[in-house]
Amino acid sequence: MSTMLRIVVGSILLAGAGVCADVVVDQKDRKFSKTEVTIKPGDTITFTNSDEVAHNVFSVTPGLEFEIHRQAPNERSTIAFPKEGVVEVRCSIHPRMKMIVTVKK
């Protein structure tokens, strides 16, 4: 299943499961606006790109992998985090960009 399809299906399933929070994390000056975020299972993070360059946000944390692929300036993408874990989020274009997402009840 493609990443985008998983995001859409996950979002639809989570919409009926109760109230979920959405945290917005901006990308500007080749860094994330937040270096650490704590959310609950089912919550989402919307990654916005306010930078003048493209980004490629991803995680290879086992069981919580995702990849947004090339995100052009002014684009936004939402990722659902369905289960508990500590997720390292990076940008493959700018290796110094890093944030930690802690998903816990």
Task: Annotate each language-model stretch with its function.
Residues 5, 11, 16-105:
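Extracytoplasmic copper-binding redox domains, predominantly the cupredoxin/blue-copper superfamily
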Residues 1-3:
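N-terminal secretory signal peptides that target proteins for export/translocation
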